[in-house]
Amino acid sequence: MQLNSTEIAELIKQRIAQFDVKSEARNEGTIVSVSDGIIRIHGLADAMQGEMIELPGNRFALALNLERDSVGAVIMGSYDGLSEGMKVKGTGRILEVPVGRGLLGRVLNTLGQPIDGKGPVENDGFSPIEVIAPGVIERKSVDQPVQTGLKAIDAMIPIGRGQRELIIGDRQVGKTAIAIDTIINQKDSGIKCVYVAIGQKASTIANVVRKLEEHGALANTIVVVASASEAAALQYLAPYAGCSMGEYFRDRGEDALIIYDDLSKQAVAYRQISLLLRRPPGREAYPGDVFYLHSRLLERAARVNAEYVEKFTNGAVKGQTGSLTALPIIETQAGDVSAFVPTNVISITDGQIFLTSQLFNSGIRPAVDPGISVSRVGGAAQTKIVKKLSGGIRTALAQYRELAAFAQFSSDLDEATRKQLDHGVKVTELMKQKQYSPMSVAQQSLVLFAAEKGYLSDVELNKIVDFEAALLSYANTQHAELMAEINAKADYNDAIVGKLTALLDDFKATQTW
């Protein structure tokens, strides 16, 4: 068989048409040095700030310092086996984490990988860990409450959906306890929770997860863990990863709550990374951008309007606002709130719950100091009945603390002062609450009403706790309809006042405490 020149030309053209060569441009570099979790790379000319760099052994580093001749990157995880001269690749991707409802009930690491042994995580996609916060026009004012279930906080330092409320205090004063109680109280509220553990002992985190599971709150919670044994880079990135997971719900017209436990350890991890990268240190050896470290994180907690949600979901969700409420925790040293990181976070947040060792050690738990604790926007979100009843409580406690200071120097006090002191002591006792026992709005309202209307005046101080327990038990069994009505509407009117008065009069007549 002979082929003429035309057929040969056609065959060659067909072969050329079928020949597929794909050119692949790779951004490669060489490791120049490895030390203390930091690598310096030569040759990654197109690297971006925050880009993931692929290392040998399916590991990644994060590009943080872009210099003229080299790139400084922090290794996310172990750096065993890495040595000078190894090749690395730029991925062209910013760090992303999985997001979605499938993450609820799971314990994850900073990169969104499961560490609870329950198999792979189902996700609805991925989200960058660094996201620009919603703008001014996209926000809505805070006017709906987040019930912590702790009467001292819900009455005196109320928290609203979309607020940033700092929990601050020394070590071992109950900061995490407040956060965990708040999560437990959300299991039936529809608010999804994210708990970010930064730089904590693995045993402490395991205990928190176990308590959430025991109280049925884990199914509504995502736990993100960067324990004390993990690399500084993972501790630094964990809050941003958790925030992206919480934003998934906010941007779809739902409510979410995120707890950062704690941001002091994140700041220390960031300081360690910055010093190793040879960035110039500032006050307390922190880098110059440590304020921005926390401000860009906490500004992402917001209440967004219906237009923002509709635009984000491409019209799938209409007429619904979304919120992400943040409860950052800061640990102080010997009560020093004027240190660098505490003052930064106080100025960023919308108020603070200040816990003191003195109150904690004297048995007042939660150890909230009402004198310097404040909620700047939560008052607008407080339920009507609790707002009406709590005004007198805060005043009574403030007057009591003022009078108690003077009473130490004077033995003969007039009757009015004695009554105020007696009332203040009893209200302080009434504000105590056991851990893992959150109270409903109706239960809080009943207890506050009893204090406000003088029903504690003839109750001995050592009987206050028993009085409260017996009162709540009586109300739940004999007046269940009234309690359900208050929980549903939370109104304060003459009819409710009449019913509460009748309930307390009937209870006082039983003398069952």
Curated annotation (Swiss-Prot):
EC supergroup of this enzyme: translocase
Major localization class: membrane
Record's signal peptide: none
Keyword Ribosomal protein annotated: no
Organism: Aeromonas salmonicida (strain A449)
Keywords in alphabetical order: ATP synthesis, ATP-binding, Cell inner membrane, Cell membrane, CF(1), Hydrogen ion transport, Ion transport, Membrane, Nucleotide-binding, Translocase, Transport
Function: Produces ATP from ADP in the presence of a proton gradient across the membrane. The alpha chain is a regulatory subunit.
Feature type site, description Required for activity: S373
Catalytic reaction equation(s): ATP + H2O + 4 H(+)(in) = ADP + phosphate + 5 H(+)(out)
GO molecular function, a single term: ATP binding
Similarity comment: family membership: Belongs to the ATPase alpha/beta chains family.
Listed name of the protein: ATP synthase subunit alpha
Location(s), subcellular: Cell inner membrane
EC code: 7.1.2.2
Residues involved in ATP binding: G169, D170, R171, Q172, V173, G174, K175, T176
GO cellular component terms, semicolon-separated: plasma membrane; proton-transporting ATP synthase complex
Pfam families: ATP-synt_ab (PF00006), ATP-synt_ab_C (PF00306), ATP-synt_ab_N (PF02874)
Assembly and interaction partners: F-type ATPases have 2 components, CF(1) - the catalytic core - and CF(0) - the membrane proton channel. CF(1) has five subunits: alpha(3), beta(3), gamma(1), delta(1), epsilon(1). CF(0) has three main subunits: a(1), b(2) and c(9-12). The alpha and beta chains form an alternating ring which encloses part of the gamma chain. CF(1) is attached to CF(0) by a central stalk formed by the gamma and epsilon chains, while a peripheral stalk is formed by the delta and b chains.
Membrane topology: Peripheral membrane protein
